[in-house]
Amino acid sequence: MKNAILAASLFASFATASVHLAHAEESGKFSLETGMDYNTGKYGGTQSTDILYVPVTGKYQGKSWTLKLTVPYLQITGPGSVISLINGMGPTGVAAANTPVTRSGLGDVVVAATHNAYNGGPSGLMINLTGKVKLGTASSTKGLGTGKNDYALQSELYQVTGNLTTFGTLGYKVYGNPVGYNLNNVFYGSLGGSYKFDQETNGGIMLNLGQKVTARGSSRLEALFFVSHKLDKTWKTQGYVLKGFTNGVPDWGVGATVAYLL
């Protein structure tokens, strides 16, 4: 997962796919992005947990490096905590019958750095290396986070052929272990493709996969259908629909972002 909470995983994956669809944006540019993600799922339990995730992201894109800082607001309504959702083990029985509780506050802040390791130019091949640190800033008392830092390293490959871009990601994540839990470090990845309809609009599909975080937990498998549209030289919008296929991800979700190039 890209974050301790599943909603963050959606935004991070979608951003990775949409930012590098063809040639990189102009270097030496700052941008600000915000949006909203809503997803819901039972995570193997009997009652749904709803998640609202509102990130604010600042990004600096240089010639070969991209730096990102994401500060999110998080709201969870339901019986599930972050730990149970990560495991894919939603509450059942008496716990699931309890009145849903809404918890909200600061989510986990994420810092990321991406290096363009190879840009093949006319060949259309691009390879990136990304390092991420998820700071445990979300309240573990409220069940909004684990309270621990997580670390991830991933490689990203893009192949542009005409209007079609295919892409894949392979990463490894090291989890911080909260008190009373032993979370496994996991491999994760994604595969997908995007089609450029015109100079302003592209859309596509991506499949996200990940190992289970605990022995009793569930693996991750979800599909995202996304679209991105440039309004002008400074404004860009993005949106997606999610369908989950395992207990380790939401049953479904929707989201949208808007970015402004400074």
Regions found by a protein language model. Name each.
Residues 1-29:
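Cleavable N-terminal export/targeting peptides
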Residues 23-177, 186-240, 245-253, 257-262:
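Transmembrane beta-barrel domains of Gram-negative outer membranes and organellar outer membranes
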